[in-house]
Amino acid sequence: MLYQLSKATTRIRLKRQKAVPQHRWLWSLAFLAAFTLKDVRCADLAISIPNNPGLDDGASYRLDYSPPFGYPEPNTTIASREIGDEIQFSRALPGTKYNFWLYYTNFTHHDWLTWTVTITTAPDPPSNLSVQVRSGKNAIILWSPPTQGSYTAFKIKVLGLSEASSSYNRTFQVNDNTFQHSVKELTPGATYQVQAYTIYDGKESVAYTSRNFTTKPNTPGKFIVWFRNETTLLVLWQPPYPAGIYTHYKVSIEPPDANDSVLYVEKEGEPPGPAQAAFKGLVPGRAYNISVQTMSEDEISLPTTAQYRTVPLRPLNVTFDRDFITSNSFRVLWEAPKGISEFDKYQVSVATTRRQSTVPRSNEPVAFFDFRDIAEPGKTFNVIVKTVSGKVTSWPATGDVTLRPLPVRNLRSINDDKTNTMIITWEADPASTQDEYRIVYHELETFNGDTSTLTTDRTRFTLESLLPGRNYSLSVQAVSKKMESNETSIFVVTRPSSPIIEDLKSIRMGLNISWKSDVNSKQEQYEVLYSRNGTSDLRTQKTKESRLVIKNLQPGAGYELKVFAVSHDLRSEPHAYFQAVYPNPPRNMTIETVRSNSVLVHWSPPESGEFTEYSIRYRTDSEQQWVRLPSVRSTEADITDMTKGEKYTIQVNTVSFGVESPVPQEVNTTVPPNPVSNIIQLVDSRNITLEWPKPEGRVESYILKWWPSDNPGRVQTKNVSENKSADDLSTVRVLIGELMPGVQYKFDIQTTSYGILSGITSLYPRTMPLIQSDVVVANGEKEDERDTITLSYTPTPQSSSKFDIYRFSLGDAEIRDKEKLANDTDRKVTFTGLVPGRLYNITVWTVSGGVASLPIQRQDRLYPEPITQLHATNITDTEISLRWDLPKGEYNDFDIAYLTADNLLAQNMTTRNEITISDLRPHRNYTFTVVVRSGTESSVLRSSSPLSASFTTNEAVPGRVERFHPTDVQPSEINFEWSLPSSEANGVIRQFSIAYTNINNLTDAGMQDFESEEAFGVIKNLKPGETYVFKIQAKTAIGFGPEREYRQTMPILAPPRPATQVVPTEVYRSSSTIQIRFRKNYFSDQNGQVRMYTIIVAEDDAKNASGLEMPSWLDVQSYSVWLPYQAIDPYYPFENRSVEDFTIGTENCDNHKIGYCNGPLKSGTTYRVKVRAFTGADKFTDTAYSFPIQTDQDNTSLIVAITVPLTIILVLLVTLLFYKRRRNNCRKTTKDSRANDNMSLPDSVIEQNRPILIKNFAEHYRLMSADSDFRFSEEFEELKHVGRDQPCTFADLPCNRPKNRFTNILPYDHSRFKLQPVDDDEGSDYINANYVPGHNSPREFIVTQGPLHSTRDDFWRMCWESNSRAIVMLTRCFEKGREKCDQYWPNDTVPVFYGDIKVQILNDSHYADWVMTEFMLCRGSEQRILRHFHFTTWPDFGVPNPPQTLVRFVRAFRDRIGAEQRPIVVHCSAGVGRSGTFITLDRILQQINTSDYVDIFGIVYAMRKERVWMVQTEQQYICIHQCLLAVLEGKENIVGPAREMHDNEGYEGQQVQLDENGDVVATIEGHLSHHDLQQAEAEAIDDENAAILHDDQQPLTSSFTGHHTHMPPTTSMSSFGGGGGGHTNVDAPDRXHSVVNQSDNNNSVVIVLVDNKPSSMICKDSKGGNIDVLESQQQQQQQQQQQPNQGGHNITTISAINGYNTLQHRRKSQLITFSSSSCDIKNSLSHEYINGSNGSAANGPPSSGSGSGSGPGSNRASRANVRLSFAEEDVMILPQNHSQQSNHQDDEVFTRRRSLLEVEIGVEVGEDGELAPHEMEEDLEEEDEDEELYMHDEFETHIDTKSNNANDDSGGGSYEDSHALHSSLGGSNRNSLEKDDDDIEVDVISTDVSCYDQLLGSSCNTRNGDDDDIATLVGDGDYSTTKLSKASRLSGAGVGGLVVSGGGGGTAIGGGIAVNGGGVLGNGVGSEAGGGIIYANPFMDDEGIAESGM
């Protein structure tokens, strides 16, 4: 029984009468009724006296009341000064009427009745409340009256506590004394609360008594085992109907062989769908009884039961004896299964035939069987071996065997001399099958030589690698799947290679020849054939050498030669050549004529021999190279163009066919040299230098002669050698010195070579005169002469130089030069009319005969003109613009000068006639002077006279206040003084303004103005303890000037003392405790915020209690009367409330030695209490003491007598409840049990390092994982609070809060990554990231959250500023429809700027589980390469499954990123869970290479000290251990033994790998080519279930509509009915109606996800096959005509017709099935859901009956037991919102924990149990691991149903209600048990859930097929074969199936489905005389056992 307490308050206000006029008081009486578990019979009253004259010593009050039960006692008198503001009354009786009287007495009045009232106290609640549950809808409530006090009635409230019954709220009032009430119309399984109240005199009890109870839940529906293997049964059942309320199911199995024979399964979904449970660890082949019950709280329903059997173990190691393989027979061998398994025999068959054989079970370890008389040589057969236990077969063990092919025929060879190759041809035996041919050849003559082998698939082959000149043996074999036929052989010979002539030389009367041969060619000898030109004489010489000399030939004659190689009597191709013999030389050569540059030569012909022409050549003595002239036939030649001055040698020779005589004829001669020309004269006053180009030809020296023209007798001579004439070899230079200035001379020049002189060259040069005059400017310094220059000079003496005149020039083309005679006595020259300011270049010469002397040069500049006007065009506060007129003449610039405010001269230069003077002081007068300047300082500079003017600047804003500081600071106000220098006034000051801002609260700001003459001011109303920024500005008429800033923290003083009546009040008391109440508003924040409170307790309040250091409870224990003491350390209680109730005396201080302790009070003792408030550590103020409060007397012995038994009972109940919950939730995490964080250990007592030796790690893992990972849970719990006490100050700043993705994932201050601040912007250095240690560095990683869209620029800044070269991303951008991370990188290769950082994708590589991308980062001119590692299959809060996937990813990462490349940026969504797991695994994988131990706990501990919640969940913590265990055990890349899928043509040769628990971990290998893989969209939906064994280092990317999916090239995906195929993930947001085109040459299918929009009807696969999709009934009706199927792919349509659980009832996901086009029953059926109560088929009219066969002859009653089996990979479920988010691989697939598989009409796939945190703290708690991972391997269904077809005209009948699933949907309650041995058993081979859909009440249509889909039905008589027709939907009771004529008459199999009965296959089975069974399954054997893997 539980008491719920409440509080009620009644306040009555009374006004006192006018007995004492000077006292008018307003009194109020407040009644506070409080009930506790200890004492509920008391009521407390407070008489409030607001204006009590407490200083009147004579005044008092007397309180009287009846009945006399309460405290104070009746007629108690209390002095007025002792009361304070109120009188406390307590201990009133419950359910009682009280009368109160209050009397007042003072000096003038005695017992004056001031107030009276009658009050009824509230009654106690009822007692002994109980509930009797009668059924699921009825219950009786019973109770007893209260133990004390009166009552008149009772109120009963019934409240629904369950979610479904929360609206149930009924209230009943019971006025009689029956003390019970009946409640009806309750919900079965619901939980309710009963609340009982007592009513007395219209008042309810303030407390109530309550009790919870639960009604019985309804019994669950029927169930099936829809998946099983050798050790596992997966049970699927329907919920109760009506469902009612229940929390979970209890599922049990007998015999109890399972690991857990009793399972508890939680209910999922609302309304609840079918549920499931898995029993593992069963014995293969054994029968088991299974029961299912519903549970709600402690209530349990009646059971539903059935019996099923497990699958036996399969055979092992199917092999073939190669010695027994012939062209028509073979032997197969196999081993018995290992382990315990029950089976009777073996079944052996060949997949392509219908022949099956059985082999009895024996004790031999190896069994065998011989297949004979197979007339198909070379063909490959798939042999299937199974164990059979009863009617159940095991999974198949298969092997491929190929028969030996027949030998080839007609083998021939042909040599091709043109290409030097050999072609061989042959014929294949038409009776044999082969896929290639093997060619083997070797050389016969070579011992131990190499044998070459080639293969081809054609019957013709060209051999190009045979060596020339060899004899070979060659054989050909036919090969089929590496099985060879017998050999067929021949011999072949090759021709030798042609020799190549290396050297052929002419000799006297003969030829010398040599050659070389191919090193690979063999030859026996060589033959040389030669003949003379023009004759038929052919001669032959043979030799074994590679050279030959031929003699006695005709001189000058030509010969043709051929060389052959000979081998095995075969000649090679010849090598031919033509060569002539040396001719005889000419005779009698002479020189006939020598001219200036030519020579005529003559000679005589030779005496004998042949020749064709004469060759002529010549050269000089200094040259080696001959110059050859054209050949001639005459006996003379004219040689021209010879070089002058050279000596030549000339040769003449005879020539025959290009071969010259070895002895030529020669002669020598010399040519005269050339004279000089083009002489250049270089003349000065004393020298003449002559320079001419070197003449053509040879010159040895030059001869020069010269003399004065007027004196020929003075001749001088000079001889100049050619080698000394000049440095330049192309010219000749000669200097003639010591000549007279101004004189003319004559020169003669000749050349000489080999003693021969050339002609004479003459010339007449003159020397330059001298000038020795001194020239000056006479007026150069006169400023007023601005247009005239006068020159003055001295004469040059005639004795030193001959000249005629003087010449003067100013260098101006407009001014003519002036000349004066040499003997002129006037020595001045004047130039007038010049330009002012211009610079003139003055030049003076002497001239003799037109030759001028060197010049004398001077410079002079005239003064410029000054300006005449100066005025200002614009004036501002700091600038004046000036303008003036332009002067005449030339000038360079203007010089503007003025005095600054500091009296410094400032000068400005400008070339324009205007200027703007800046940086002036406002409100100042300035004088400006302008001077015109011509020239520069580096040349001649002239300045004009100046012109001045004065101007004044405008006003401006004032300057910065110079001095600004406080003179007095108080908690809430501050006094300032300031000053502004006059130089900074910048005008007339109008005012000063002070603005202030609280830096911690920007809204706390203001501004105050002061007069211009004020220099002091005060700012008020500030907040104590806050820091303010004060800014002062001066103001002129223009505006405010710049700010001067001062920062001040306001002081904090003790709080103001509150009023005397403000004291703590009593709330409750006991014998050792007092509970007081005080409020936040007791103290004002005027002197600073009150930060802490403490309690002062005084028994003797007269003692001093105002000191800072107060005695503690321990200090006063030695006093009989306790001194005032402090009860607790200061604390702050007003975080979320304004009232605090504090209990004094609650602690046990026996072990408390130091500090304050809230020890117990003394019983029956009066205390006073006051509250102390602190604004600082030493700043405090106390309230006045409270009214006296007396503790109760001690009743401890009574309490102990009651409490101890109750405590023992409570402990037992808690223990029992804990044991029960742990049993029910054996795999639950301890999340709920950890709700109280106070149970966690502090960091100081946690052992931070826990190293484990690597050699002991496997045993350590076994111990930790025992008992449902209990020790892992304990160890992980110790990490819960590690590091959580560290500050996150910066992350919580207002400017940084929007940058955090989650409000409780904040970076610690000490380890956060700090960005470079931007422009002093607050928070610009913040990003949610921390440094985390790695194996190689304490700052190896930067862990951050997934970037938000608003923080991705900061993210790239962090990558750049940290110089990181790698990013590891462990999340997808969207998961379950929620954003986990912004896509912070470009979509394509186009560069994108993120802030000032440009990011461009260089390349990317796609793998099955991750993507690696290279980015180019650019910032300014700097570039970097960064790698991005994106793991794409990690579920949020989950772990990759298998864990080896994560190990391979870490390995791939570390292979590319070295230890020195750090830091590494790592992020997931929050940056804690997955990121921590990755880093831990990276560290331990490196640690095990260098150490003999690992410390996973220590690594996680260290990371949590740097960033919050690293490795967030226990599941992730365990995953790290699992990864390491896999690495240490060598299972990093090994994922378990191979298993095989269903034996079916669509599964030929396919295998799947399972782990030791039977979980799927690898792919199904099938007939799938690499080309098929490239076209498949093979990305797995969930990495925990994806059956893909991939090669991490071989990426393959296939594209679909612009979106990439990934598939490893070495992977064969599961084939759903064909040889290939695979999963496909619709990968784009807008692909809700898209179809992934998936090609397969073995009839694989395409996977489609479509919603209910009309656009998704029928789609085409890549071969044109139809793809039917999930669609509504309306769409199904609109799509009766399907498009043509060109590729043979047949895929199912699923539609809904408002059935029990149709698409309208689904809420989380949709179903997609994979199907096959042939070879199983399901391929002739489609899936259409029907109404369970509708008697018509889906496509037939309602009148057609309920599920009949469509053919005649099926009248006889029959029973069919149907099994369905399908593999995990055959069914894939995607969420309905999958079209909006791509790549949600972790959302759904079967093996998630809470939801395994959802079938459209009864099984719903729930969420995978993972939390998806987004903006809420509770989402980030540990993952709830209630989910049970039931299975990872294949799914199958075994349903035994029995059917009795009633006789009717339609050939079919109703289906009996014994069908298990039908019963659960509304049929009878009869269980579906194992069939009888005599029953006909039909095994349906299915690879999707379509067959299961049929069992749930669906009807079936004939699957569309092509002409190749043939099903053969066999009877005892004749049989016929009917092809499945395209679109053969038949109206009628069922659907048109296969209609055949049976053996002997009238057996047929109808395609109908029993609709109302929920039938599966309308097998009309009939017989006639001799008629037998018709097998509906093309794979069924003679015993009715289908090859289904069951």
Curated annotation (Swiss-Prot):
Compositional bias per record (Low complexity), positions renumbered to this chain: 1673-1683, 1732-1745
Lineage: superkingdom: Eukaryota
Protein's job: May have a role in axon outgrowth and guidance.
Active-site residues, record numbering mapped to chain: 1468
Compositional bias per record (Polar residues), positions renumbered to this chain: 1684-1693
Extracellular side: 43-1197
Name this polypeptide is given: Tyrosine-protein phosphatase 10D
Domain Tyrosine-protein phosphatase: 1272-1527
Ranges annotated as spanning the membrane: 1198-1218
Every Fibronectin type-III domain range: 125-218, 219-314, 407-498, 499-584, 585-674, 675-771, 775-865, 866-956, 957-1057
Keyword list, A-Z: Developmental protein, Differentiation, Glycoprotein, Hydrolase, Membrane, Neurogenesis, Protein phosphatase, Repeat, Signal, Transmembrane, Transmembrane helix
